[in-house]
Amino acid sequence: MSSGKIAQVIGPVVDVLFAAGEKLPEINNALVVYKNDERKTKIVLEVALELGDGMVRTIAMESTDGLTRGMEVLDTGRPISVPVGKETLGRVFNVLGDTIDLEAPFTEDAERQPIHKKAPTFDELSTSSEILETGIKVIDLLAPYLKGGKVGLFGGAGVGKTVLIQELIHNIAQEHGGISVFTGVGERTREGNDLYWEMKESGVIEKTAMVFGQMNEPPGARMRVALTGLTIAEYFRDVEGQDVLLFIDNIFRFTQAGSEVSALLGRMPSAVGYQPTLATEMGQLQERITSTKKGSVTSIQAIYVPADDYTDPAPATAFAHLDSTTNLERKLVQLGIYPAVDPLASSSRALAPEIVGEEHYAVAAEVKRVLQRYHELQDIIAILGMDELSDEEKTLVARARRIQFFLSQNXNVAEQFTGQPGSYVPVAETVRGFKEILDGKYDHLPEDAFRGVGSIEDVIAKAEKMGF
């Protein structure tokens, strides 16, 4: 183990000088320094640059308060390594793989893997385009997720991103026995805390590993925490052969942390002040999220769009990697339609006849056409009323409203708030239900019977209760 001494500390950046004859640490190696406090607190630094003459520049993963020039720094000889395997389920970690819940810490001999790895090679990748059934009608019908694909989840505050994420974790765990890894990147600590307790109450936590790099942490930790979560997910994929769900909230904050680190390292900023290495950093993360012949990692990434500008380099760079987009819309929340997924703005590469089948594709296309036409007619209805529409248009509007309500459903994880049991609807049931609505089979049933239900059988049962 070679050792050096701290030469200077500039916020989260620490320069370390290694004496002549000492082996210089490699880029991305973890260095360790112990503070002079009572607990001898360990601070981990990651090597970012070699400046020459035995000097390396590092980024701290924790606060550098208390570090002084001349302190001894040890090279661990390897990158940051985090615990992996079944023991991580139900636990909460930070970027270094240390547990931050109140339960017993991991033992020193627990299996660990480095957070820096190469993406799978071409011959390791799986070429099949298989749909990941979520049991959520609006997603499965109109913007299906691919196994091993990447989904962008766009939405403002209070439109149901967290509930949708929890429902996806619940459904994958219940129906597929799948594992989920939740990674909070630059999360508000309060939100992360709420999510942890909600997941504990709903029982989903047993199939989930959680990793947090909160908003108050140094940029190095926020930048690397996504890799920590991904490393845990990769182990389940490659060693256990599992289909894993990886949630990253928020991918924009990963970019933001990278921008801060880049400025601290003295790199010249690029467009809009972002780091010149933006596309490379995003690519290194995204290319590791994929399906191999052993298993898959499907990622659902919340993406904040600064000032609603989709041409901003941060969301624009993320877009290039996405297979599906799920857009949450505030207008649907106001109508009481949950999940508030916008059926016209959401899209998926998987919605193609060769992947989902001819019938599914045709039904989805017709649902979109009917909703689009209803959208166009809304101005006429608002100004002149329904009476000005032709009989054909009146029928279309009635069916569109039934479709809009049928796209909603009660979530299992929200049962404690709504008092209504949640539902999981297989894709075949979803397609059949919408096909029958489009064919006019249920034109005689009241609109309210379609709201917040699962399959079409639930609609019929609800209508009977209402006296129809």
UniProtKB/Swiss-Prot annotation:
Its EC number is 7.1.2.2. Disulfide bonds: none annotated. It catalyses: ATP + H2O + 4 H(+)(in) = ADP + phosphate + 5 H(+)(out). One of its GO terms (cellular component) is proton-transporting ATP synthase complex. It is found in: Cell membrane. It is an enzyme of class 7 (translocase). ATP binds at residues 155-162. The keyword Transport applies. The keyword Nucleotide-binding applies. It holds the Pfam family ATP-synt_ab. Keywords: ATP synthesis, ATP-binding, Cell membrane, CF(1), Hydrogen ion transport, Ion transport, Membrane, Nucleotide-binding, Translocase, Transport. F-type ATPases have 2 components, CF(1) - the catalytic core - and CF(0) - the membrane proton channel. CF(1) has five subunits: alpha(3), beta(3), gamma(1), delta(1), epsilon(1). CF(0) has three main subunits: a(1), b(2) and c(9-12). The alpha and beta chains form an alternating ring which encloses part of the gamma chain. CF(1) is attached to CF(0) by a central stalk formed by the gamma and epsilon chains, while a peripheral stalk is formed by the delta and b chains. Belongs to the ATPase alpha/beta chains family. Produces ATP from ADP in the presence of a proton gradient across the membrane. The catalytic sites are hosted primarily by the beta subunits. PANTHER family: ATP SYNTHASE, ATP SYNTHASE SUBUNIT BETA, MITOCHONDRIAL. This is ATP synthase subunit beta. The lineage of its organism: Bacteria, Bacillati, Bacillota, Bacilli, Lactobacillales. The gene is atpD.
